[in-house]
């Protein structure tokens, strides 16, 4: 009986040719696993294609709701970003995929897990560290670090040789990753920084100059930091993301052209579409500015950056990530209320906040006198606050 390998399968170029390559070079029984995080593929087609390509079995795991509730809601609550720009759409999906791969490897008693990540990318780290954190006995096969195929053009040639159909041509050769949260585009002419990216690549977003000519007003209600209602309507978590992707997309919201520092050392360029995430982060940030005290708000910004770096670097299965989640959950206890946004041709303008947990007090913040604050109090405060500066000036160093 042949030993088994569980393959992270998408039906795309890389994983399509890996099936015959594994059989040819390792003589393994290939169990394909497609983790459905909302990439929008025809799963019946994916199943058929995996079997036609030589897999003995195909699992399709629909984890969209788990992805939103257990991963994306953590992103929203923490407002995690990598290098202040990247909303981590790929990064948040990978630990969930690794979790499912290990579960099926255990179920199938497979000794190997295989992925189609390149040897220059971050995903190889995310998958492999995620697998090792759950079961260090499982062996990893990473074809892009082993085989003679050196480019995506080579991969297309190999696909033709072994008779595997792939939805990519040499002329239009972007690497695309798609899920509920985002679409990323890399490779091809994007690798030359002198090239403006082409707007016809967009899947989710209308180019801002072609977006609606009238502004859209949007209300998002959060409960303890998590979105619950859109325009007053309670929706399930997946529908919330879908609806906001539609609203944001038709208003030209959510495009980012980013140069990022990869974990493996080099810089890379990616075009990201994240309409729902962009709207949710903007609304959540506004609500936090009203409901969090000064020091919690400022410290959380530091923690958010650390959280984004952890997730980007594939360190989901760590005690630090769990500890940050616990801190973030504490900060979200009063992050409940409604934020109204005005959307117009790629721009977001926060309009209003309605929350019973506001730390903003109009009576205190106005220029008039109040029982809690007297203008005369400012003089003593300024003297004490400025004392270090005054002492230094007197010393005349």
Swiss-Prot record:
GO terms of molecular function: argininosuccinate synthase activity; ATP binding
Top-rank EC class of the record's enzyme: ligase
Annotated binding of ATP, by residue: 8-16, 116
One of the protein's GO biological processes: argininosuccinate metabolic process
Reactions performed catalytically: L-citrulline + L-aspartate + ATP = 2-(N(omega)-L-arginino)succinate + AMP + diphosphate + H(+)
Stored PROSITE patterns: ARGININOSUCCIN_SYN_1 (PS00564), ARGININOSUCCIN_SYN_2 (PS00565)
Membrane-spanning intervals of the chain: none
Ligand binding (L-citrulline): 86, 91, 122, 126, 175, 184, 260, 272
Protein residues bound to L-aspartate: 118, 122-123
Principal location listed in the UniProt entry: cytoplasm
Biochemical pathway: Amino-acid biosynthesis; L-arginine biosynthesis; L-arginine from L-ornithine and carbamoyl phosphate: step 2/3
Subcellular location: Cytoplasm
Alphabetized SUPFAM superfamilies for the sequence: Adenine nucleotide alpha hydrolases-like (SSF52402), Argininosuccinate synthetase, C-terminal domain (SSF69864)
Enzyme Commission (EC) number: 6.3.4.5
Pfam families (alphabetical): Arginosuc_syn_C, Arginosuc_synth
Keywords: Amino-acid biosynthesis, Arginine biosynthesis, ATP-binding, Cytoplasm, Ligase, Nucleotide-binding
One GO location term (cellular component): cytoplasm
Subunit structure: Homotetramer.
Protein family: Belongs to the argininosuccinate synthase family. Type 1 subfamily.
Protein name: Argininosuccinate synthase
Species of provenance: Clostridium botulinum (strain Hall / ATCC 3502 / NCTC 13319 / Type A)
Gene: argG
